[in-house]
Each structure stands twice: as C-alpha cells, then as structure tokens.
Amino acid sequence: MDKVFDYEDIQLIPAKCIVDSRSECDPTVELGGFTFRLPVVPANMQTIIDEKVALMLAKNGYFYIMHRFNPETRLAFIQDMHERGLYASISVGVKDEEYGFIEVLKSTGHTPEFITIDIAHGHSNAVIRMIQHIKHHLPGSFVIAGNVGTPEAVRELEHAGADATKVGIGPGKVCITKIKTGFGTGGWQLAALRWCAKAATKPIIADGGIRTHGDIAKSIRFGASMVMIGSLFAGHDESPGETFEQDGKQLKEYFGSASEFQKGERKNVEGKKMFVEHKGALQDTLTEMEQDLQSAISYAGGDSLEALRTVDYVMVKNSIFNGDKVY
C-alpha cells in the first residue's frame, strides 16, 4: 500500500476556465439507465431518509436509496413509487428472510429499479450469495453491493454480478467501527476510493467521510460515480427524527446504522448518536451542493463532471483549512 491520504490532505489544482458562467456546467450523472441531477445520494440511514424524503428526491430528479430498517413496509413502498410513475430504490440485508423477500418481489411482479445490499462488511460470501440470488430472480434490478474497502472486494462483488460497489468502512461521522474493531477506511477513505476505483470496471459509490461540498468533487476526481453522504444531509426540516431545543438552538438527532439507537439494543454496536444543528430545507442544501459542484467543474476547466476526473492535485498534509471552519 503506498502513501495514504484523506479529503483534507488533497487540494485540486485549477485549469483554464472554458465557460462564461458556472451555470453552464452540468453536474448530472447517469446511473442504472437514469440521469440524476447530482452525483450525490443521501445515506440510507433512518435519521436521513424516509418515504417522504425518498418521494421528494425521486420527484425532483435526485438519486435516493431507502433504508432497510422497516422491512415490512418495503413492498408497499415499491408499489407506491411505481404507481406515482417514479423509480423504486430499496435496501436489503443478507439474513434468511431477505431471500424470501426477493422471491416475493419476483412473484408479485414488483421489480425495484435499484437494490442496495447494505451490510457493514460487504466482502463476504453472504453478500456474494445475495447478489447471485437477486440477479437470478430480478435480473432487471440494478444491484449496488457493499460496503467494501479493497480492490479484491470490488473485483469479487463485480464478478458475482454487482452493477456497482459501495466503498467505505467506518469513515462516517456517526460510525465507530474504526474505534471498536481497529479496522476500516477512516482517515484514508479518499485513498481507499482511489485504490478501489483502479480495480473497478463498474460504477463506485463513495460512502462516508464527506464533510464539505468540495469533498464531493474530490471523490469524483478519485473515481467515484456517486457519493453517499450522511451528516451533511442530517438535521433538515424533512429529516426523520425528533427536533428539540437546547441553549436556544434547534437540534436534530443523527445516529449510525449499527448504533444501539437504531438496533434498539446494545449488541455489536458500531455506531453512535449525535445532535446536529437544524439546517432548514433539504432543497436549499441540494441547490447549494449543485452550485458548488458547478463551480468545481468550472475550476477543473470543463463543463461536465468528466472534467473533474483528470485534474491535477497536490497533497497538503492537513493544512488546507488553516483553522478555518466553514461548516
């Protein structure tokens, strides 16, 4: 493994601008036969997405992945989205009952456009078996598999039939896998992304460790097709979870998918809970992300996301903020 680095260690180098206005830059991305307005997807976590948020995102041309923590509602969710003329994108685990669920989808004719196999350690026989099961019964579904952190894992999951892989083991703000187990991509997520992307022949979704909008551009530069983000999407008007006031500030809860708050028990806990300041409307954040990404594309010297993939960069060991705190 050569020298590793993370988002704050990298600065992209500007190239000559070819547009008159950043609004000419196109930040759309294609995935699974759909074109989405941004290469960004809110994390499939209980305090980030629910049916209402999924509906808002799908209606407005954004990608979403519904979480898997209310399994009994998934079939109705797929039906509802399809009745509205929208795409359905769900998550599954790898437990025995999930095999039956996939068979039910086949027998009832409800094929979701996207299925994400969502477990903490995705480089496993359990995930490979589930990919094969889904591809056998629902060949029309675009399968995203994860999470992984090595090129070997990417190659194996692609070979098993995954249409995209999700890269990131524990770099998230409410993930404590790195602390509880000693394993993960926390602190070198961007290097892990580059390492995995070099082995990939299909799209990669970078998952975790995004703290600023500039990190989205950096993810694209190092090989991501799509970027999954939790903390920046937490705490909005539409976000699930309780809002409350403390010291005159409006706060909302945000917790990890392997936390006791999500599990309802203290067993194999690898997530924690935090409180984030209330951020207002989700659309405002999406619009700001879009504008920042358009600016990034203009700095890259192009007019589409492709321009970001080839820009030069420098390594600046942990110094780029000089103590500035933007977020």
From Swiss-Prot:
Biological process (GO), any one: purine nucleotide metabolic process
UniProt keyword Plastid, yes or no: no
EC number(s) from the headed UniProt entry: 1.7.1.7
InterPro entries: Aldolase_TIM (IPR013785), GMP_reductase (IPR050139), GuaC_type_2 (IPR005994), IMP_DH/GMP_Rdtase_CS (IPR015875), IMP_DH_GMPRt (IPR001093)
Reactions catalysed: IMP + NH4(+) + NADP(+) = GMP + NADPH + 2 H(+)
PROSITE patterns: IMP_DH_GMP_RED
Enzyme class: oxidoreductase
Keywords per UniProt: NADP, Oxidoreductase
Disulfide cysteine pairs (residue numbers): none
Residues annotated as binding NADP(+): 204-227
Example of a GO cellular component annotation carried by this entry: cytosol
SMART domains (alphabetical): IMPDH (SM01240)
Protein origin, superkingdom: Bacteria
CDD domains, per database record: IMPDH
Alphabetized Pfam families for the sequence: IMPDH
One term of GO molecular function: GMP reductase activity
SUPFAM superfamilies from the UniProt entry: Inosine monophosphate dehydrogenase (IMPDH)
Catalytic residues identified in the record: C175 (thioimidate intermediate)
Protein family per UniProt: Belongs to the IMPDH/GMPR family. GuaC type 2 subfamily.
Job of this protein: Catalyzes the irreversible NADPH-dependent deamination of GMP to IMP. It functions in the conversion of nucleobase, nucleoside and nucleotide derivatives of G to A nucleotides, and in maintaining the intracellular balance of A and G nucleotides.
Protein name in the entry: GMP reductase
Taxonomic source organism: Exiguobacterium sp. (strain ATCC BAA-1283 / AT1b)
